[in-house]
Amino acid sequence: MIVGCREDAKRQWDPQGEPLGQVLNEMTSVDKTYRWEAQDGALNLLPTAGEPLLLQTQVGDFKIDTTSSLEALNQLKTRREIQHAMLNLRLQDGLTIITYSPRATPFSVRFKGGTLRQALNAIAVAHGSDVWDYREIRCGERKEVIIRF
C-alpha cells in the first residue's frame, strides 16, 4: 500500500465466518484499486496500479533459521539488494510497532531467489499462517517504507 499525507476514510465491515476467497472478492469489488492473487501458498492483496518497486526488487537465495518472522524480516532487510534498492528509491525504514508471540517456535526459510514479495511470502508460509504488511508513506519530503509481520 502506498499512502500520502492524509488517511483514507475507514469503512466498517465484519467478514467473520465467510470463506477467505469470498472475503477477498468482496474487498476488491468494493475497492477497485486492489486485486488479489495466490502465489506459492500465500495470498497477496496488491494495488491494481502496479506493485511497489521495492517489492519487485530481486533477492538472491538464502536460508534463515529463526523463531520469529520479525527476525527473518530483519535479516532480509540487511541484504545488500534491499539496502541498494531502498537507497535508489530514496526510501527510509519507517517506524514499526513490534508485536510478538510469547510461544516462539523454531522454523527455517529456504528461498531460491526471486522478488522481495516472494521472499516475504516464503517467510510467511514457512512460519505457518503469518501475515505481512507493506506500506510506503510519501508525504512531502518524507518517503518511508514499513514492512511488518
Spell out what each predicted region is.
Residues 1-149:
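N-terminal targeting/assembly segments of extracytoplasmic apparatus and virion spike/baseplate proteins
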